[in-house]
Regions:
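Short, well-ordered beta-to-alpha junction loops that form the rim of enzyme active sites
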Residues: 203-207, 262-265
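Histidine-centered active-site loop/cap adjacent to the catalytic His
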Residues: 273-305
Length: 305
């Protein structure tokens, strides 16, 4: 086996993991588990939440569960951060390995012309026995919206009744159906253009933490305020729910099984302990998300032991 990856270096990267480290982790995984599936994570910080979490190294916070075996093989020292990938590996055990290729602070529209390097890694390495989990698009609204997105979100948040959102009659919803269905389909199609995996799990984002639920400062406070979330959280929540129904549940990739997952069923905006900065999954939030995802992944693994 090749050299192990320096754990501090592996988690130091803000935007995803360094490609060299990912390549090393992938090689170690293949050497350790050549016949087992890899679960690739693609998208944004809803899956790449490591930056917001405490270290498990001395001076940090102790893990509440044993370190999954794959980290003992890949990291030196074997002290992973308890991010979404960690919890997936905890639940999956030796049956499959989760590998995080999602990128913090990345956008869906960034991928319109060219894939990110992390996406290209997935495209070039994913196999027929593997699975792909995608969660992307939230930063196009909350972090760096373009002018068109801002206009449609303001129309939806301030000039549209909740009842029209819930009925699907709100005209601004069409814009976001294009984003979360058509644009996500194009993105996923690029990821699987060389090899089609066993299945793709496409996620709709969770609800942000409600202002009334717990006091947390957030980089997204201004955006959440502009969207009316601090005053009427139910309105944005209704929009996310409807976008799941009209967009995520309708995603289709020719020749591929697509399973929609509503992360807001797990992170519902009511519990401060599930969040960091109101919009990032905490250790506990990531654990809950991983548990939800594994419930979908387990049947797809079939007889893998």
């Amino acid at each position: 086996m090749g050299n192990k990856i320096n754990a501090s270096q592996f988690y130091f990267e803000y935007k995803g993991h360094a490609i060299l480290d990912i390549s090393a982790f992938h090689s170690i995984t293949i050497s350790q588990r050549p016949t087992k599936p890899i679960v690739y994570l693609a998208g944004d910080s809803s899956l790449d939440n490591k930056f917001w979490l405490p270290s498990s190294s001395p001076g940090g916070e102790r893990l509440t569960v044993a370190v999954p075996e794959i980290y003992k093989a890949a990291l030196k020292p074997p002290r992973p951060k308890p991010d979404v990938a960690f919890w997936l590996n905890h639940y999956l055990g030796s049956r499959a390995t989760a590998l995080n290729l999602a990128v913090e602070a990345s956008l869906l529209r960034e991928r319109n012309s060219d894939l990110l390097a992390h996406d290209e890694f997935i495209r070039d390495h994913i196999r027929a026995e593997d699975l792909l989990v995608v969660s992307v698009g939230a930063n196009d609204i909350a972090m760096r919206p373009n002018l068109s997105t801002i206009c449609h979100m303001l129309l939806l948040a301030w000039l549209t009744s909740t009842s029209r959102i819930q009925s699907g009659a709100a005209l601004p919803l069409r814009y976001f159906v294009n984003m979360f269905k058509t644009q996500v389909e194009k993105y996923v199609a690029k990821l699987v253009e060389k090899h089609k995996p066993r299945a793709v799990v496409v996620c709709m984002i969770y609800f942000p933490l409600e202002a009334q639920a717990a006091k947390q400062d957030s980089w997204a406070d201004a955006s959440l305020g502009a969207l009316g979330y601090n005053r009427w959280p139910h309105r944005l929540q209704a929009a996310i729910t409807k976008m799941y129904e009209l967009a995520t549940q309708k995603v289709q990739i020719p020749g591929l099984s697509v399973i929609p997952v509503a992360l807001f069923e797990t992170l519902d905006g009511k519990r401060g302990g599930d969040y960091v900065q109101r919009v990032e999954p905490s250790v506990e939030g990531g654990r809950k998300m991983a548990s939800q995802l594994v419930a979908v992944i387990n049947p797809l693994l079939g007889t893998v032991e």
